Amino acid sequence: MAHFIDLNSLTNTLPSLPKLPESRKTGKSSGFACRRTEEFQEPDSVQITRRMTLGFAVSIGLTGILGENNVSLAQDNGFWIDGPLPIPPIYNNIVNEKTGTRTFIKKGVYVADIGTKGRMYRVKKNAFDLLAMEDLIGPDTLNYVKKYLRLKSTFLFYDFDNLISAAASEDKQPLTDLANRLFDNFEKLEDAAKTKNLAETESCYKDTKFLLQEVMTRMA
């Protein structure tokens, strides 16, 4: 039978490792800790000072930027809203004579006042977007067609009203006629998409397409 080594007896026969005095070990550790503390204490204080300086500078800058006068200027720039979205007034005869409004107008849309040139650009861009909507028309997408039409036509409606007001006297009536023809067609197109009549939607869109091209030519 094989003999197994007694681990306890083997451990007892090994020479014991010498132990350092406790005082020397403690002194070495504490000395090292003190040196490490001295090395990092100064950078921490410098870092804190820098942060305080930076924070103070930022607070001064924000005080100057967000002062009462500057807030007042921001409120008057046409982009600052501190209440419900305003409904722009209509100054020209571009509403439906029977309803006094337009069925496609979407509520809750903020139409920023970006000046006459900005409105002309926005009219041209929205007309271009509606021309690109032709690829969206399909049997399963008429709901999206209606939503997209309402969003774009709302901007067109309010922008046209302001452009008519800013136009020369000889241009007011031609712009009004173009706007009414376009918006009458928008209402027909919206109704066809709402009733999910694909054939009627496609037919109305063909007429709308020519009017949109005329709008882009007029705003070029």
Curated annotation (Swiss-Prot):
Effect of gene knockout: Impaired chloroplastic NAD(P)H dehydrogenase (NDH) activity leading to the loss of post-illumination increases in Chl fluorescence, probably due to a reduced stability of the NDH complex.
An annotated GO cellular component: extrinsic component of membrane
Membrane topology classification: Peripheral membrane protein
Gene3D superfamilies listed in its UniProt record: Oxygen-evolving enhancer protein 3 (PsbQ), four-helix up-down bundle
Keyword Membrane part of the UniProt annotation: yes
Molecular function terms from GO: calcium ion binding; electron transporter, transferring electrons within the cyclic electron transport pathway of photosynthesis activity
Subcellular location: Plastid, Chloroplast thylakoid membrane
Keyword flag Transmembrane helix: no
UniProt KW keywords: Chloroplast, Membrane, Plastid, Thylakoid, Transit peptide, Transport
Residues in the signal sequence: none
Gene Ontology BP terms: photosynthesis, light reaction; photosynthetic electron transport chain
Transit peptide boundaries: 1-35, 36-77
Assembly and interaction partners: Part of the chloroplast NDH complex, composed of a mixture of chloroplast and nucleus encoded subunits. Component of the NDH lumenal subcomplex, at least composed of PnsL1, PnsL2, PnsL3, PnsL4 and PnsL5.
Family of the protein in this entry: Belongs to the PsbQ family.
Function: NDH shuttles electrons from NAD(P)H:plastoquinone, via FMN and iron-sulfur (Fe-S) centers, to quinones in the photosynthetic chain and possibly in a chloroplast respiratory chain. The immediate electron acceptor for the enzyme in this species is believed to be plastoquinone. Couples the redox reaction to proton translocation, and thus conserves the redox energy in a proton gradient. Required for both formation and activity of the chloroplast NAD(P)H dehydrogenase (NDH) complex.
Official protein name in the record: Photosynthetic NDH subunit of lumenal location 3, chloroplastic
Record organism: Arabidopsis thaliana
Gene: PNSL3
